[in-house]
Amino acid sequence: MIKAFAHIETELGKVFAQHFTAINSDVESEKVNNLWQDIAIRYNEAQRAYHSLQHIEQLFAQFKQIKHVLNEPHLIALALFYHDVIYAPTRADNELKSAEYAVEALRPYFSAAQCQYIYALIMMTANHKLAECSSAQKNFDSAYLLDMDLSILGASWSEYEQ
């Protein structure tokens, strides 16, 4: 089982690096890897049942199928990685804390507009409602992100129970 988790972590780390460097290829790979390691550590915290790396892996299985229709696939991917990075089961502000955390982590590498969009995407996962975005293209991408996040509710019972 631990070997399977290590494989998930390694593969997702590669995916994270691909999307990150597609936006900013000037960042040293060590810095990108450090960002990923921090994400992986957080998704492996003991209090997580559903909001784990397995959830992120499931999201990216779907993402692969639809990324070609997205206007900003790399920003959507980063929002997926960060959307549950902060998780305390008894708190109601996990999405806010995750959005703030993402912006803090990404601000040195991305534009203010890119960080704000990732923040807005993560905040939409709090109530799974589309917020007013500055363009129809961003609303389109946002809808896909929310659909992916809620897709477990339409999965088979055996998949849902995992």
List the model feature ranges, each with a label.
Residues 32-40, 53, 77, 115-126:
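Short, well-structured alpha-helical segments
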Residues 1-56:
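Conserved N-terminal diphosphate/IPP-binding helix and adjacent helical/loop segment
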Residues 47-50, 85-93:
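Short coil/turn segments at secondary-structure boundaries
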Residues 30, 68-73, 135-141:
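Structural motif
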Residues 59, 73-89, 98, 118-126:
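His-Asp-centered metal-binding catalytic motifs of divalent-metal-dependent phosphohydrolases/nucleases
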Residues 111-162:
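Histidine/acidic-rich helix-loop-helix segments that form or flank divalent-metal centers
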Residues 45-75, 101-109:
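Alpha-helical phosphate/pyrophosphate-handling elements in metalloenzyme active cores
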Residues 93-102:
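Post-HEXXH active-site segment of zinc metalloproteases
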